[in-house]
Design a protein with these regions (language model features):
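Nucleotide-sugar donor-binding/catalytic module of glycosyltransferases
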Residues: 1-170
Length: 170
């Protein structure tokens, strides 16, 4: 059983999907599975997903009729085998150590939920990187019991499902 199941809903992102898949392949921790849910994408995404699964057994593919991102995530959850679950949007990419750091942190803290920040890269029309913006402040620490009211503004900034790791329970 993999430590982390990474669920990737896929729809009409043919130009971005290769970077997301490459970021998964580049992970320093090999103990993951990626569940690619092709949500009836009209472009070449289904073929890209199938090719990834043929090349690397850690990728699994679900093809379904278009039902929206929520249904795609739920289909991925139903197929997940990992101790933990993470969602990755198909036009995003993970830093190479992301899975390793999340896995280590989850084990060390016995966390049911880890929330983390991220950043957005900006590019000019010619593809030149022009900058980077922190899109969620990083809140470090282990919090147990009732959350402190002063944490709410920071927690709401990190409330995107793609900025969290969840313990999956059967």
């Amino acid at each position: 059983m993999p430590e982390i199941s990474i669920i990737v809903p896929v729809y009409n992102v043919e130009q971005y999907l290769p970077a997301a898949l490459d970021s998964l392949r580049a992970q320093t921790c090999p103990d993951w599975e990626a569940i690619l849910v092709d949500d009836g994408s009209p472009d070449g995404c289904g073929a890209l997903c199938d090719a990834a699964a043929r090349q690397d057994a850690r990728f699994r593919v679900i093809h379904q009729k278009n039902a929206g991102v929520g249904a795609a995530r739920n289909a991925g959850l139903a197929a997940a085998r990992g101790t933990y679950v993470q969602f990755l949007d198909s036009d995003d990419a993970l830093e190479p150590q992301m899975v390793e750091v999340l896995c280590r942190t989850a084990k060390q803290t016995d966390a049911d939920l880890i929330m983390f920040g991220g950043y957005e890269e900006h590019y000019a029309a010619d593809g030149t990187r022009t900058g980077c913006t922190d899109i969620a402040p990083v809140l470090e620490g282990v919090y147990r019991g009732d959350p402190c009211p002063q944490l709410f503004p920071q927690l709401s900034a990190m409330s995107l499902v793609t900025r969290q790791l969840f313990r999956r329970r059967c």
